[in-house]
Amino acid sequence: MTSIFFNRHYPTLESACERWGLEFDANAEFELVFENDILTLIKRDEPKLKGIFVDFVTGAVAHRRKFGGGRGQSIAKAVGLKQGVTPTVVDGTAGLGRDAFVLASLGCKVIMVERHPIVAALLEDGLRRGYEDTEIGDWMRERMSLFHGSSIDSLADAPQASNTEVDVVYLDPMYPHREKSALVKKEMRVFQSLVGADLDADGLLAPAMALASKRVVVKRPDYADDLDGVKPSMVIATKKNRFDVYVKAAMTA
């Protein structure tokens, strides 16, 4: 079981931790708290750092939804979004759900797979608040869902559970930053210290290719090697990252 510190006199917290199999540990490095009805992760030995939480309603993701370039964004091109085509996507490495939310806001149905129970708990809470929002709740409930389990084992399990045919598998494995830690965003540093690098990421490509009917998209830092050493069909480059696209079949309406 994953250990975490939390206030055991807070019933909502205790039930969330119980649901995700999180074990109370008075000496745990991380703590889960509710701040303004938002489930938040805090690194206990760095109290000055902001807590980590999932927010689909306000902040950066809301700004990107409104002003981020729509289907002209690189991620939209990578998954094959075009006129009349809105693929069903399994996000095999959901993290804090930001890329999944972008794709869902553009019309894709997205099943998020997250293997770390603390991150899954944060995602569930973010979905809860998103579903309740009057502006985005209706389409979020239709298009965004969460499946918890090992990314490799669960790639096929997630769509089977909802009887969904998958057009695209999207992967964004955690990759070690080559910059010195001071240059890495503090939030990302905390997040990496929680989940670690995805050292088994190369093992994701084969099951992803088996599951996707149309293509697999892998988001990588610009300096990273090809996933599992396999050359992609095409590459869409951005300022600091790239999307490696492994095409199996044409995207058709």
Curated annotation (Swiss-Prot):
Residues that, per the record, bind S-adenosyl-L-methionine: 98-99, 114-115, 150-151, 172
Gene3D superfamilies for the chain: Vaccinia Virus protein VP39, YhiQ-like domain
Record InterPro entries: 16SrRNA_methylTrfase_J (IPR007536), SAM-dependent_MTases_sf (IPR029063)
Entry's localization field: Cytoplasm
Reactions the enzyme catalyzes: guanosine(1516) in 16S rRNA + S-adenosyl-L-methionine = N(2)-methylguanosine(1516) in 16S rRNA + S-adenosyl-L-homocysteine + H(+)
GO molecular function: rRNA (guanine-N2-)-methyltransferase activity
Annotated TM spans: none
Primary location class: cytoplasm
Highest rank taxon of the organism: Bacteria
Enzyme class: transferase
Enzyme Commission number(s) from the entry: 2.1.1.242
PANTHER family on file: RIBOSOMAL RNA SMALL SUBUNIT METHYLTRANSFERASE J (PTHR36112:SF1)
Function in brief: Specifically methylates the guanosine in position 1516 of 16S rRNA.
Record-stated family: Belongs to the methyltransferase superfamily. RsmJ family.
Annotated protein name in UniProt: Ribosomal RNA small subunit methyltransferase J
